[in-house]
């Protein structure tokens, strides 16, 4: 296994990508209907894995339509919020958690940027309506605040 992903369908999601400081307010990115993708890469992951991940995640039928049928985020059409989530790689040890299996920060950042870029490319090439669809993403390596409105506890774990 080289990557772990959690998918959560959403009605609206808002992610703080820069905390407030003395000189500026917090910065946020947000999406409307679509999917939140939490992603963690493990040691040994390479860029070769990214196309398969993006194809699977954007085409899997996990989004519920108005009629109650399930479709992909591409066919919905919906937006995607990508959240780097290194804690998905944690393993319990005693009363704490260890993250020794996670990829190094520099390598992880490169894979994350490639993943985001390919998601953006796939979503933009699949515009099939006038509905605004977009890919937004969090900041790799930083703590972030997430606000999420979901249409049911509909969360899936996928490993690649």
Curated annotation (Swiss-Prot):
GO terms for molecular function: Ala-tRNA(Thr) deacylase activity; D-tyrosyl-tRNA(Tyr) deacylase activity; tRNA binding. A motif (Gly-transPro motif, allows the protein to recognize chirality of D-amino acids) lies at residues 152-153. Keywords: Cytoplasm, Hydrolase, RNA-binding, tRNA-binding. The keyword Nucleus does not apply. Its EC number is 3.1.1.96. It catalyses: a D-aminoacyl-tRNA + H2O = a tRNA + a D-alpha-amino acid + H(+); glycyl-tRNA(Ala) + H2O = tRNA(Ala) + glycine + H(+); D-tyrosyl-tRNA(Tyr) + H2O = D-tyrosine + tRNA(Tyr); L-alanyl-tRNA(Thr) + H2O = tRNA(Thr) + L-alanine + H(+). GO terms for biological process: aminoacyl-tRNA metabolism involved in translational fidelity; tRNA metabolic process. Deacylates mischarged D-aminoacyl-tRNAs. Also deacylates mischarged glycyl-tRNA(Ala), protecting cells against glycine mischarging by AlaRS. Probably acts by rejecting L-amino acids from its binding site rather than specific recognition of D-amino acids. Catalyzes the hydrolysis of D-tyrosyl-tRNA(Tyr), has no activity on correctly charged L-tyrosyl-tRNA(Tyr). By recycling D-aminoacyl-tRNA to D-amino acids and free tRNA molecules, this enzyme counteracts the toxicity associated with the formation of D-aminoacyl-tRNA entities in vivo and helps enforce protein L-homochirality. Homodimer. This is D-aminoacyl-tRNA deacylase 2. It comes from Danio rerio.
